Amino acid sequence: TIAYGLRNLTDFEGGLREMYRVAKPGGRMLVLDFGKPSFGPWRWFYFTYLKWMVPMFGRIFCSDAPAYAYIHESLEHYPAQDGVAKVMRDIECREVTIHRILGSAMTINVGVK
């Protein structure tokens, strides 16, 4: 299980392969992270919010806007839910599913070894 961390790895596919390697047969792999909504208006609002509002809140409440700006930046190169599901299938996970939360703003990818 990994939460809000896979997109921060330099080799997210390698991270998934390692999770698969250490999982017991029949064990579940879960990946919780930010997603990429497919519905156009929601996607626009979501990414606008992440790019502008989240860093502003980070500056106001935590005095650290760059730490929160990083969320949007890290999503630009992250394949999100569909890319994670594809890699899970490629490494032979079974029963791969995507649970979409808040219109795919957050997602949980699940696979079984």
Regions found by a protein language model. Give the residues of each.
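A short SAM/SAH-binding and catalytic strip from SAM-dependent methyltransferases
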Residues: 1-12, 35
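Residue-level signal for the nucleotide or nucleotide-sugar donor/cofactor binding architecture
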Residues: 7-11, 76-79, 106
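Short conserved AdoMet
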Residues: 10, 24, 113
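C-terminal alpha-helical "lid/dimerization" subdomain adjacent to the S-adenosyl-L-methionine
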Residues: 32-91, 97
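C-terminal lobe and adjacent flexible extensions of AdoMet/dcAdoMet transferase-like proteins
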Residues: 87-113
